[in-house]
Amino acid sequence: MYSLFPSLTTGFSVGSSPEAEKLPRAVEFSKALYTLDIGQNDLTMGFRTMSLDKLRSAIPGIVDQVAEAVKNLYNEGGRSFWIHNTGPHGCMPVNVLYNTSAPSPGYLDKYGCVKFKNDMAVFFNTVLKERVVKLRSELPLAAITYVDVFSAKYWLVANAKILGLANPMTVCCGYHVGNDHVWCGFKGKAKNKDIVGPSCVDPSKFVSWDGVHYTEFSNRWVAQHTLNGNFTDPPSSIAQACHRH
């Protein structure tokens, strides 16, 4: 779909319509920063439908598709790329909300995250970073930044208490007590009463919004600390992301 965009905008810009002025000029496509964020849903579905061995063996192929997308953008004139790795899957509260009994030893890490899921995410990110290094040599005119979203989000989980946040394995929105589970904004029963999954009073005190998605506070924190280069390779701010290092 992207390959059609430059040619279509060029065609529209030939006219004098006011709408044409809102479209990027052809020269701007090579100056743009292209952001790729892939892997989260691939692993989520993999955990649901595949054995761990099969999922692990599928990861190089998934990463190859990311690399192919970068190459296609490069061939279309793209030169600057901001590539996110995948986050700590095991640290999403949805993983533990239904656990009513104590987990087996080694199932959780010291912050309450499901260890095997984070291990798989780390493997995915290792393969992705190796591929990014290879892309840098294959695409000599490209500026490619690897963004370590995993480390940023894991740091937030690990330091939630220091930051004055609630237990990172709890959620702001939704009702999850014992065997009663009503998801954020959905209708359901709790203590034999009809309710709608409620929101907490202060979302800025929580890491997770609904067990899967992060709160606005968390997303802002991660954005600030990746945009300034704290969790990027090379370690430079987004303002420098369009420059080769």
Name what the model sees in each region.
Residues 39-43, 69, 76, 88-89, ...:
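Conserved beta-strand elements of beta-rich interaction domains across eukaryotes
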